[in-house]
């Protein structure tokens, strides 16, 4: 029987601004990627999100991003491998302290936004991120775009690596996500999203925007908790996976 993880980015509120449906979405996912205060989030939000995730029995991961609150961490920043290393270690450490203070254990790390996408195609950046995670705790799982430079870097250094796919994004022929700036980057039709997800998990294939069918490894599925229909979609995707005989759990092997 196939097993797949359902993950969601959360803890993105800060100050007076409230984002997402964190409390509600926790009922449907198996792992949570918590913003660490750079692209979103703040100390109070980090603490509260960790508390909610622990209560729900959801695996907790750090979601480090660029220091770009205005751009929500989605704008490319040209940084050196050393700067990327420091950025990731710092943010992992911040969230890990909150997890430990609440009596929990951190499970994984998933880079955010532009940092994630850049690391998918840039070996030096990917290796610096993987090294940062490994040096902090070699038992942490690295979540990265399926088949990317980031997952390769994680595997090379000896990390448990989860190849991630996206429920609501389209793919390019090289296995990367269609940039949000391009047409048809987001799948708005729920049935199309569900069909894509089931096929990626069951068959290990995805149809790209170029009309070419490519292989893909799906260890974890990213869903988003901030859309108008996020909760209904989260419920639908769980039902679809269960209906296809797929176990939903945050379990990964080397």
Swiss-Prot record:
Q: Which domain of life is it from?
A: Bacteria
A single Pfam family it belongs to is LamB_YcsF
Q: Name one GO biological process term.
A: carbohydrate metabolic process
SUPFAM superfamilies registered for this protein in UniProt = Glycoside hydrolase/deacetylase (SSF88713)
* Protein's name in the database: 5-oxoprolinase subunit A
> Source species, please?
Brevibacillus brevis (strain 47 / JCM 6285 / NBRC 100599)
Q: What does the similarity note say?
A: Belongs to the LamB/PxpA family.
The task this protein performs is described as: Catalyzes the cleavage of 5-oxoproline to form L-glutamate coupled to the hydrolysis of ATP to ADP and inorganic phosphate.
* Record's subunit section: Forms a complex composed of PxpA, PxpB and PxpC.
Which gene is the coding source of this polypeptide chain? Answer: pxpA
GO MF, any single term? 5-oxoprolinase (ATP-hydrolyzing) activity
Enzyme class (EC, first level) = hydrolase
The record's catalysed reaction(s) read: 5-oxo-L-proline + ATP + 2 H2O = L-glutamate + ADP + phosphate + H(+)
InterPro entries for the chain: Glyco_hydro/deAcase_b/a-brl, LamB/YcsF/PxpA-like
